Amino acid sequence: MAGVLEGVRILDFGRYIAGPWCAGLLADLGAEVIRVDKIGGGEDRFVVPITDEGDGAMYQQMNRNKRGMTLNPTSPEGKEILCRMVERADVVVANLPEKALVSLGLDYESLTAIKSDIILTTTTAFGTQGPFSEKIGFDPVAQGMSGLMHLTGYEEPMRSAASWVDFNTAT
């Protein structure tokens, strides 16, 4: 049975949970998803527990149903490859701060200069404006800053074992 997103091509520049989970859900629905890692592989590949194959179990779960490649989008050859990939893609998924998107050529203006109807979906811990917009944040940071840890800890604040913020943001 064909998925509802069959024929849709997605470039996944997501890291850790929110981006990869979002792209993984789209892959589950039939989209062709290409996970693009930095040369040498993404740092989220090695989050424990590590499988016998050397990959983190979470990395394998987040990247199921995807193809993968490595790319340096800041090198001349990498920029050319990225341009060709964007020309053939429908959606780009990334969860990086705005400055990182711009430096990699993954910001909306750069992408639409290549393909006018490309869809860019991004998520960041602190949004694109404001004093924390360029900071990187993970689920435990959001839990702590929002007060959630105070609700789950007794007597001291405690992080929830599940990364609720990341998973809910991705969906």
What are these regions (language model features)?
Residues 1-171:
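N-terminal helix-loop segment corresponding to the beta1-alpha1 unit
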